[in-house]
Amino acid sequence: MNETEQAALAQLDRLNGAQELHAAVLALLLPPGSQRALRAWKNECAKLPHIRQVLEWVGQLRANARLPLFETLLSRMRGQPLTERQALLEATRRVMAARGILRPIDRLHWIAMRQRLGESSPAETRAAATSELSQLPESAVAAIASYTAFLARMVPTEADALEDTAPTEAGLTWYAGVMAPWAKRAAIPPCDPPDTEGLVQALQELQSVAWMQRPALVRAWVEAAVLHGRLNDTAADALRLSCSLLDSPLPPELAWHYGETFSETLA
């Protein structure tokens, strides 16, 4: 990370006020090159005196520095009044909708925001005597298949066109690799990404899986992904957001993707 990036990250890390956090969180969600989303962001943040500076600072960050900062600022936003948190969620919905097409990563950002800001709660966790994933009930395996199929739109690669809702060939291969351990027990469903309701239902089922089994699932996702080469930023962000939603630590291969940016600068 060069001095310009370090300075921008340090400035953004000083933000604490509701309006500043509001603007920075939204800026971190902007899709690269989207003029519609940028106009929507400017409309949402027009009252902030230093709006241009916030956008410039965010623009100076590397892609793999954005999600860790997003998580930090969102945690601070949780300490703001309920009206401020609700205003951020409403603004997020408008900015995300400005393009007319919602990216898969946008859906994960949205779910993570609702959970971190206290708008939704994880499902109650079941107990388990082992971390072995082969012992999971059929309902959990079905949820793994559904959620993994959703991730396959981003991991290990994305489709070139946002309109294409099907996973890439690499995504299909990754899905098959993740689901292979259960193939001996039952037929594995095809890689069919769920809609938003199905995604939320699958996530809630996974959140109820025992705490010692969730890290094993996350490791399976990451280990299958790195077989295709170094993680790209979208794939890494999708997996990191999933770790957060499942309250699971980052596997080393995933932590490495972010380790040379945010943590060292703010240590």
Residue ranges and their predicted role:
Residues M1-A97, I101-A267:
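Small-residue-enriched hydrophobic alpha-helices in membranes
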